[in-house]
Regions:
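Conserved acidic E/D residue at the C-terminus of a beta-strand in Rossmann-like folds
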Residues: 1
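Rossmann-like adenosine-cofactor binding region
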Residues: 4-102
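C-terminal helix-to-coil terminal segments
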Residues: 96-152
């Protein structure tokens, strides 16, 4: 996280300065990060090798349902082959869709999931768009805007 949180009973980390400490306490890494210059390639061999080996499998697991640009495919496959990574569940890739010949399809310790969002209810979407239009007409700012400088 960019911003420190205080949650009872939970160790919280923030910023690049605490990334290695976070990784050292993490045996299952779940990435739901947006695609930004800061997150490009963050799931790489260095990151994998900093993860805890204290979990139930003796090697870490990664789950990426964020963006494909975050992961370095060759590093993940090499770490799996070397036993440095117990498994990977991947929902996103570069390129998408994942090519039929990719080793991710056949690697015994990789689970590939379809990158699909939930079904959208047209009535709910229309009501939300109408709400945003009403805000705009009233001189209020739109809600839930993307911060283009941050990329999410």
């Amino acid at each position: 996280s960019r911003t420190r949180k205080e949650l009872p009973g939970i160790d919280c980390y923030a910023g690049a300065a605490e990334f290695d400490a976070f990784l050292a306490r993490t045996d299952i890494l779940v990435s739901l990060l947006p695609a930004t210059p800061e997150t490009d390639g963050v799931i790489n061999r260095r990151t994998i090798n900093k993860l805890s080996r204290e979990g139930p499998f003796g090697a870490p697991i990664i789950i990426n349902a964020g963006r494909g640009r975050q992961q370095v495919a060759e590093d993940i496959l090499a770490a799996l082959d070397a036993g440095e990574l117990h498994g990977a569940t991947l929902d996103v890739f570069v390129p998408e869709p994942l090519p039929p010949g990719s080793r991710f399809w056949t690697h015994p310790r990789v689970t590939v999931t379809p990158h699909t969002a939930a079904d959208s209810d047209p009535e709910v979407i229309c009501a939300y768009v109408a709400h945003q239009i009403a805000r705009h007409r009233s001189g209020l700012a739109f809600e839930n805007l993307v911060d283009k400088a941050r990329g999410y």
